[in-house]
From Swiss-Prot:
Native source species: Xanthomonas axonopodis pv. citri (strain 306)
Reaction(s) this enzyme catalyzes, per UniProt: L-kynurenine + NADPH + O2 + H(+) = 3-hydroxy-L-kynurenine + NADP(+) + H2O
InterPro entries hit by this protein: FAD-bd, FAD/NAD-bd_sf, Kynurenine_monooxygenase
PANTHER family xrefs: KYNURENINE 3-MONOOXYGENASE
Keywords from the named record: FAD, Flavoprotein, Monooxygenase, NADP, Oxidoreductase, Pyridine nucleotide biosynthesis
Necessary cofactors: FAD
Keyword tRNA-binding included in the entry's annotation: no
Record's protein name: Kynurenine 3-monooxygenase
């Protein structure tokens, strides 16, 4: 059993979660060493197969505040007020996320965020070693070997405990699995994604509304664009792997150009390098990872995507991982040995991770199929009215997940009740003029208790 009194931890992965956890633990007096497979992004530029834009919500901002990192990060973020929905015919319409500009989310470039957190981790006292790819682990002897892929040289260390913050393709998870099966399962979507770019205007500034997440919903597929602080947008096309249209039928730049001309005509002139980027950027996979357990007693633990990777459609992967970091730091404070702290962390986070994984999958259907559906828009209108009348009881799904820090599992349970109420109340109606408000009040008060933090 590893006593917390030794206060030494080795992190695998200097990405977003690894750097934030390194800050939190270093500030609490832990000796933290981080090993990263890639080179230092501050020297050689950022390399990642991951999406280069992220949506930062209140959960993530709260974690950054705990680490003293919020100001440095928010200086690089762009506010997004809502979804700007681009129909095939007609003008784009903004669907606000919240009631006003106090309820927004923030777009941030993954590289800028990673560099900011890396700087702060080192300032807090963490030691970060680059070009160290985890190769083998002897959990019984507390020994690990890393390889420098530049020269194939091995580097060996002794450790007290390993924490895997090395993402969905976690090398530590693979090593743990070889030691003792974790019950790993990955369910891939039958959709993949490809990233493109909208450049800034010649004189600088955004070519389209900069304070929104743009969506082109087209039923079985969709395109989105998130703003960057340099005036660019990162465009992501989500497309089926097979069928028409799909990545199987849209292989060349010319085929992509034809797809955009037909289905995203207002986006096409904004992406001058569409053909080149289409052929240069391979499609990315989308999947949900589940494990039966996240730790090997006190010797190793997985957090973030390494433990519970999810599809990106709720913008919560990073926010959830940041919540993991705070929860783990708190459990380490509360327990005298690492095995107990790791077990308590997993028990505290497992149901919430499963809930946001489910909600992320559900949000994909909403984004691609429903944001321009009349029934959905009427339900949204009623949702806003119910929130205005009973703000502590009827709290919209998006508000609970994004603007509050309501536990994901609670947000999921309440959202399912609220969806039933909205569907039942609007069935057969084309507007809200004949809604029975007194009957609705009785239903809301009977089925929804006041929610902590709602206002």
């Amino acid at each position: 059993m590893s006593p917390v009194s030794q206060r030494s931890l080795t992190l695998i992965g200097a990405g977003l979660a690894g750097c934030l956890l390194a800050i939190l633990l270093s500030r609490r007096g832990w000796q933290v060493t981080v090993y990263e497979r890639r080179g230092d992004p501050r020297i050689k530029g950022y390399e990642s197969g991951r999406s280069i834009n992220l949506a930062l919500a209140e959960r993530g901002r709260h974690a950054l505040r705990q680490a003293g990192a919020e100001d440095a990060v928010m200086a690089k973020a762009v506010m997004m007020r809502g979804r700007m929905v681009h129909p095939l015919v007609g003008q784009p319409q903004l669907q606000r996320y919240g009631r006003d500009d106090s309820e927004v989310i923030w777009s941030i470039h993954r590289a800028a965020l990673n560099v900011a957190l890396l700087d702060l981790a080192e300032q807090a006292g963490a030691r970060v070693h680059f070009y160290r790819r985890l190769h083998t682990v002897d959990f019984d002897a507390g020994y690990a070997r890393f390889i420098d892929d530049r020269d194939d040289q091995p580097h060996e260390i002794h450790f007290q405990s390993l924490i895997g913050s090395d993402g969905a393709g976690s090398a530590l998870r693979a090593a743990m699995q070889r030691k003792s099966p974790l019950g790993e399962r990955t369910e891939f979507l039958d959709h993949s994604y490809k990233e493109l770019e909208i450049p800034p205007q010649p004189g600088g500034g955004f070519r389209i509304e900069g304070n929104a997440l743009h969506i082109w919903p087209r039923g079985r597929y969709m395109c989105i664009a998130l703003p960057n602080d340099g005036g660019t947008f990162t465009v992501t096309l989500f497309l089926p792997n097979a069928g028409e249209p799909s990545f199987a039928t849209t292989r060349t730049g010319d085929e992509a150009f034809a797809l955009f001309a037909r289905d995203f005509p207002d986006a096409l002139p904004l992406i001058p390098q569409l053909k080149e980027h289409w052929e240069e950027h391979p499609p990315g996979l989308l999947g949900t990872l589940t494990l039966d357990r996240w730790h090997l007693d006190g010797r190793a633990l997985l957090i973030g995507d390494a433990a519970h990777a999810m599809v990106p459609f709720h913008g919560q992967g990073m926010n959830c991982a940041f919540e993991d970091c705070v929860a783990l730091a708190d459990q380490l404070d509360a327990h005298d040995d690492l095995a107990s702290a790791f077990a308590a962390f997993e028990a505290a986070r497992r149901d919430d991770a499963a809930a946001i994984q489910q909600m992320a999958l559900e949000n994909y259907l909403e984004m691609r199929d429903r944001v321009d559906d009349p029934d959905f828009l009427l339900q949204r209108e009623l949702e806003q009215q119910l929130q205005a009348r009973w703000p502590t009881r009827f709290v919209p799904h998006y508000t609970m997940v994004t603007f509050l820090r309501t536990r994901y599992s609670i947000a999921l349970a309440r959202s399912e009740i609220q969806r039933e109420i909205l569907v039942q109340a609007t069935r057969g109606h084309s507007d809200l003029s004949r809604i029975d408000w007194s009957a609705l009040e009785a239903v809301v008060h009977a089925r929804l208790e006041p929610l902590d933090g709602a206002h």
